[in-house]
């Protein structure tokens, strides 16, 4: 149940992230951290990011670029790695036995792939 709640919070953050554009990784990190408690407009102003409703970022404001020449496949790859490292590793430690651990890893890995490719829904990881 805790993982479902955390995944829901992460999904909410991603929906917001698609509407904000920052000039740098520092700006993106600032915005993401600020959004934990702050409003979109406030965080965008403080972190020098721009909000857009079109889903396209203006020139000079990349959406998710981690490095200057990154592209979407790299972003999806790093998203999968981060999701698995933060969510799935935690679940492995919570498993009671090897079978439960195997099931958690399989379902969690699938959830991360769906999440990072943009087709995530709120599904239970124990289903």
From Swiss-Prot:
Residues 1-18 form the signal peptide. One of its GO terms (cellular component) is extracellular region. Pfam families: Thionin. Coiled coil: none annotated. GO terms for molecular function: toxin activity. One of its GO terms (biological process) is defense response. Thionins are small plant proteins which are toxic to animal cells. They seem to exert their toxic effect at the level of the cell membrane. Their precise function is not known. This is Alpha-hordothionin. It comes from Hordeum vulgare.
